[in-house]
Design a protein with these regions (language model features):
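Amphipathic alpha-helical assembly/interaction segments
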Residues: 1-231
Length: 231
C-alpha cells in the first residue's frame, strides 16, 4: 500500500537514480554509434527514426520524473510514450537483422543468456561503449534487443506502480480538493466548539446544542431537495 502524502506535492527521487533511465541512456548512445557504424550518413530516414525513438524513450523518462511531484496523470502518459518509443526502436533493430539475413538470438541461445546477465549488472554507458565500437552488426542488434527488453520490463513495473499510486493518492487536483476539505472541516470544528463554549449555564448549553442540531437538520433537508434525493 502507498502511504497517503502529507502534503499536496509528492516527493521526487530524481530520474538519474532510476536504473531504467541509465539503460535508456545506453540505448540512446548505442543507437547513435550503431547508425554511425552501419547505416549511411545521408539519405537514410532510418537513422533519424532510430535516434529519435531512442531519444524519445530517454527524454520521456526524464520528463515523467520531473512532473511526478505535481501530476501523476501526466507522468503515466509520459511513461507510456517512453514504452511506445521502445517498441519502435525494437522493430527497427529486428528489421535490420531481417534485411541483412541475420537472426535474432533465440531464448535458449547462450549468447542471449550471457547478454542478459551482463545487461542486468551493467547499466552504465562506459561499460557498453567498448563492446559497441567493435562488435559486428548482428551482435550489436541482438545486444540492443536484450537492452530494450529489459528496459521495457522495468517500464512496465514502473507504470504499474504509477497507476496504483494514482488510484490511491490521486492527482494534484484530487489532493488539493482533499486539503481544502480537511481545512474546512478543521475550521468548522473550531467554530462549533466556540459557539458551545460561550454557554453560561447548563440550560444555555443545551439550548445552543439544540439550535445547532436544528440548523444541521434544515441544512440536510435543503441539500436533499436541491439534489432531488427522495426520503
Amino acid at each position: 500500500m502507498f502511504r497517503k502524502p502529507d502534503g499536496i506535492i509528492l516527493p521526487n527521487s530524481g530520474y538519474k537514480n532510476l536504473v531504467v533511465y541509465k539503460k535508456s541512456d545506453v540505448l540512446y548512445q548505442g543507437t547513435v554509434v550503431f547508425c554511425q557504424r552501419f547505416l549511411p550518413p545521408y539519405g537514410d530516414r532510418t537513422v533519424d527514426q532510430m535516434t529519435q525513438a531512442a531519444r524519445s524513450c530517454k527524454q520521456n523518462i526524464v520528463e515523467g520524473s520531473s512532473v511526478a511531484a505535481t501530476s501523476l496523470e501526466t507522468q503515466i502518459k509520459l511513461t507510456n510514450v517512453a514504452r511506445a518509443s521502445l517498441a519502435e526502436l525494437l522493430e527497427d533493430y529486428l528489421d535490420y537483422l531481417k534485411a541483412h539475413g541475420d537472426m535474432e538470438w533465440s531464448i535458449d541461445d547462450t549468447r542471449k543468456n550471457n547478454a542478459r546477465d551482463f545487461a542486468r549488472s551493467h547499466a552504465d554507458w562506459n561499460d557498453w561503449k567498448p563492446v559497441f565500437i567493435s562488435c559486428p552488426a548482428e551482435t550489436f542488434c541482438n545486444l540492443m534487443i536484450v537492452l530494450i527488453q529489459q528496459c521495457r520490463y522495468l517500464l512496465d513495473r514502473i507504470l504499474a506502480w504509477q497507476e496504483q499510486n494514482f488510484k490511491e493518492n490521486g492527482g494534484i487536483r484530487e489532493r488539493m480538493h482533499t486539503a481544502r476539505a480537511e481545512n474546512r472541516c478543521e475550521n468548522w470544528d473550531k467554530i462549533l466548539y466556540s459557539m458551545l463554549e460561550l454557554a453560561t449555564t447548563p440550560a444555555d448549553l443545551e439550548s445552543r446544542l439544540a439550535t445547532l442540531c436544528e440548523f444541521a437538520r434544515r441544512s440536510a433537508e435543503s441539500i436533499k431537495n436541491r439534489k432531488g434525493w427522495k426520503r
